[in-house]
């Protein structure tokens, strides 16, 4: 069958051939693209390998760069140190150079000085030779002077011997004239008697004032003891309230303050002190026994209820130390919280003190008060009260200058107007009487300062009550040596002086010389 242009078979054949071409072309393109993809994959793999190798090289280069930078910094620091070292060495070199130059200059100066000293030495040797010659000549002249003055001394010795003989004769004449002047001496003795009486009255007034001050002190001590007792009672009540409110108070104190406190012992100690302390009775003064028999009273007095202040204090304190701790506190590695001036414990019940305390008779001849308060060792006493009574220390400093016995010049200035016509001004009196007067002066001067309270002057220690009162005992000793002779005005001075050793008492002993405070 013939194909026509418009026949369906022809068109089908054309379309089949064109699709085959397209398929072939597509297959060829696919093959080309497959080949190209394969080539690209291979190139990509190669580039990936090259990239990894390049990255590793880059990392190694970065590490090398960091190492090089670090090495560069180290080298820069080392270079700076080297430069500083060079500068230091240059400074040292310059300093050593300057020292060398100064040493060279000093060496030159020392050489010049040595030359000058050598020249001076030569000049001194020549001067020494010249002075030696002059010294020999001077020795010869001095020997001549010595012989001359020796002769003059011999003549002066002869004149001095003659002068001594003349003065001896004159002294004997004066001695005879003194015998005729005993009436003046008797008049002076009468005047001295009146002055002694006036002085005794002054002593009595002073002692009464001291008694009044002591009474005031005892009253103040009582008030202070009562106040202290009330404070202790308040403290005990406060501690008991705290214990009732906080039973574990002791553990808390130990935990917070690092201090072990025995509160039960503190309360027991305080209650014992409160039970044994009493300040309700008044303080009174009692008289002492006879003063002539109390010389060794402190060592022999052993009546019941009395003891010496020291033994009483030590016995009480020894009992306290045995039964109680000092502050009832055990401090463990903590700073001190209690001042040394705070009393360690409260006083026990005061004892009746009938002891009589004697002040030693050895008194200072200078009637001056102490410049500073005396300090006493606190033998575990609970309280220490220091008062200084300066008002009574200077009584004996105001004696009239015409008084004979209170001066240290040993009667060299007795009524100089009676002997103004003589060149010795009344100093050369009859020797035996003068010796007696010297003894009287020494005896009186050793005892006229006995009201200074120089045994613990004006200080009172107390523990709960006034217990140690040996500070106010005035020992008048042998001051009144004229007790039996003033009534007879016609007796001579020798008779008056023969009674210097009598232990008669002066009127100021109304103070009783020794007293105690009875609580």
Swiss-Prot record:
Record key words, sorted: Coiled coil, Endoplasmic reticulum, Membrane, mRNA transport, RNA-binding, Transport
Give one Pfam family: SHE3
Biased composition range(s): Polar residues: 285-316, 365-380
- The answer on whether this UniProt entry bears the keyword Coiled coil reads yes
Compositionally biased tracts (Low complexity):
7-21, 436-457, 468-487, 495-508
Which compartments is it annotated to reside in? Endoplasmic reticulum membrane
One GO CC term of this entry?
Answer: endoplasmic reticulum membrane
Q: Which GO terms describe its molecular function?
A: mRNA binding
Superkingdom of this entry's organism? Eukaryota
Positions the record marks as coiled coil are 20-110
Keyword Transmembrane appears in the UniProt entry:
no
Q: Which family does it belong to?
A: Belongs to the SHE3 family.
Q: What is this protein called?
A: SWI5-dependent HO expression protein 3
Originating species: Candida albicans (strain SC5314 / ATCC MYA-2876) (Yeast)
The organism's lineage is: Eukaryota, Fungi, Dikarya, Ascomycota, Saccharomycotina
């Amino acid at each position: 069958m013939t194909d026509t242009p418009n026949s369906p078979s022809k068109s089908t054949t054309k379309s089949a051939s064109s699709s085959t071409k397209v398929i072939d072309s597509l297959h060829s393109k696919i093959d080309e693209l497959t080949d190209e993809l394969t080539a690209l994959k291979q190139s990509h793999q190669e580039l990936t390998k090259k990239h990894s190798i390049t990255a590793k090289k880059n990392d190694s280069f970065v590490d090398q760069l960091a190492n090089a930078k670090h090495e560069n910094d180290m080298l820069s620091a080392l270079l700076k140190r080297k430069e500083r070292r060079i500068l230091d060495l240059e400074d040292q070199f310059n300093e050593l150079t300057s020292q060398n130059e100064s040493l060279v200059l000093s060496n030159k100066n020392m050489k010049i000085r040595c030359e000058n000293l050598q020249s001076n030495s030569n000049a001194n040797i020549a001067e020494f030779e010249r002075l030696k010659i002059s010294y020999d000549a001077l020795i010869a002249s001095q020997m001549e002077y010595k012989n001359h003055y020796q002769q003059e001394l011999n003549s002066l010795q002869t004149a001095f011997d003659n002068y001594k003989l003349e003065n001896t004769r004159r002294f004997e004449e004066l001695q005879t004239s003194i015998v005729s002047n005993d009436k003046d001496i008797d008049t002076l003795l009468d005047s001295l008697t009146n002055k002694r009486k006036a002085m005794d009255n002054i002593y009595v007034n002073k002692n009464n004032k001291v008694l009044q001050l002591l009474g005031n002190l005892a009253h103040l001590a009582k008030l202070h003891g009562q106040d202290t007792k009330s404070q202790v009672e308040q403290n005990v009540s406060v501690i008991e309230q705290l214990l009732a409110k906080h039973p574990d108070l002791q553990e808390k104190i130990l935990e917070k303050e690092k201090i072990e406190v025995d509160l039960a012992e503190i309360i027991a100690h305080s209650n014992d002190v409160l039970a044994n302390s009493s300040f309700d009775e008044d303080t009174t003064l009692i008289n002492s026994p006879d003063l002539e028999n109390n010389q060794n009273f402190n060592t022999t007095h052993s009546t019941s209820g009395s003891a010496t202040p020291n033994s009483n204090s030590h016995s009480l304190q020894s009992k306290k130390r045995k039964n109680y701790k000092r502050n009832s506190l055990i401090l463990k590695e903590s700073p001190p919280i209690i001042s040394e001036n705070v009393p360690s414990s409260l006083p026990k019940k005061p004892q009746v003190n009938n002891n009589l305390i004697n002040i030693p008779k050895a008194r200072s001849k200078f009637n001056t008060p102490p410049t500073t308060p005396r300090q006493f060792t606190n033998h575990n006493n609970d309280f220490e009260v220091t008062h200084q009574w300066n008002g009574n220390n200077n009584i004996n400093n105001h004696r009239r200058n015409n008084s004979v016995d209170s001066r240290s010049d040993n009667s060299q200035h007795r009524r100089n107007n009676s002997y103004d016509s003589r060149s010795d001004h009344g100093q050369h009196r009859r020797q035996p009487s003068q010796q007696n007067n010297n003894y009287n002066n020494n005896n009186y001067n050793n005892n006229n300062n006995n009201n200074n309270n120089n045994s613990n002057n004006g200080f009172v220690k107390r523990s709960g009550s006034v217990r140690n009162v040996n500070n106010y005992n005035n020992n008048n000793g042998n001051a009144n040596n004229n007790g039996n002779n003033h009534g007879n005005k016609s007796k001579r001075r020798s008779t008056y002086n023969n009674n210097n050793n009598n232990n008669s008492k002066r009127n100021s002993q109304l103070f009783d010389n020794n007293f105690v405070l009875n609580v």
